[in-house]
From Swiss-Prot:
Pathway in which this enzyme or protein is active: Phenylpropanoid metabolism
Organism per entry: Ipomoea batatas (Sweet potato)
Superkingdom of the organism of origin: Eukaryota
Family statement: Belongs to the iron/ascorbate-dependent oxidoreductase family.
Function of the protein: 2-oxoglutarate (OG)- and Fe(II)-dependent dioxygenase (2OGD) involved in scopoletin and umbelliferone biosynthesis. Converts feruloyl CoA into 6'-hydroxyferuloyl CoA, and p-coumaroyl CoA into 2,4-dihydroxycinnamoyl-CoA, but has no activity with caffeoyl-CoA.
Tissue localization of expression: Mostly expressed in underground stems and stems, and, at low levels, in tubers, leaves and petioles.
Protein name as it appears in the record: Bi-functional coumaroyl CoA and feruloyl CoA ortho-hydroxylase F6H2-1-8
Amino acid sequence: MMPSTTLSTVLSDINEFVVKQGHGVKGLSELGLQTLPNQYVHPPEERLSSMDVVSDDSIPVIDVSNWEDPKVAKLICNAAEKRGFFQIVNHGIPLEMLEKAKAATYRFFREPAQEKKKYSKENCPTSHVRYSTSFLPQIEKALEWKDHLSMFYVSDQEAAQYWPPSCRDDALEYLKSCELVSRKLLEALMQGLNVNQIDDSKESLLMGSRRININYYPKCPNPDLTVGVGRHSDISTLTLLLQDDIGGLYVRKLEHEAWSHVPPVKGALVINIGDALQIMSNGRYKSIEHRVMANESNDRISVPVFVNPKPNDIVGPLPEVLASGEKPVYKPVLYSDYAKHFYRKAHNGKDTIAFARIE
């Protein structure tokens, strides 16, 4: 435990220690805190209590060992429409590769603060790599109990030059291994939207860009007072999440105030529909609010891969969806504009989708 005088100095300027010096929330947690710093205390309405959780409800787990089976596509489309979240098993990515991605996450976050801060907004020479804490610490009223490293994939050459050596090779290998799974998922989902083939223009729109994050949620002295990640929906087409065996991801039930825990399943990937696909499907597929809760017993990690349109793509309801005369619910928007809108404010549920909604 850090001496009380030093601890009080750190607590007097959390931003300096956590953000500027690069220690992150992990460094704060390792000081031996007995109580949560005020900067991380969230208002009661943003905390999740046991009364809000539906204990007997879980999202679907789909065996995708035979992608060509029409029943698999039907299960995927049904889950996308009714839940927005599902898990897949037997997806073809070896368990060893999943474990290597987790190990790479631990390696990076165990680096000294001075090494990690090389990848902060202030120090990194590229905007495609970013080490940060919380979501938008500069504007959030209450900070999230989380550190993360985000790596936007441009090319192998750029990754070799800018991604942290401690996690680069395994993170890149895992990101690439998710590409085939993403395509198979999208082929199934497009069947439900009367899109028979993913041509070059559709491929750009659906999966033109990719980003991998590695997330670290340290154990917390007062987890009931804070959040790991606040309520939000992703702006991606799809998100493929690898989580460890700790748990802590909660998903809102469609049209309910209740939340469901997403239990870790060994070897599984958690799949969720993003805002971009909700817009493209004209609301048929659901991008659902989710959040991560802190815990006091264990550190937790996760590795999401975000499959997105290209920044210069126009995202709107697909022509095939509207071909039967269905009225559009969303207007076409430039994806980069939509993303900027998302990153301009703190997490607040599904507020971002209103940016594309036709009034």
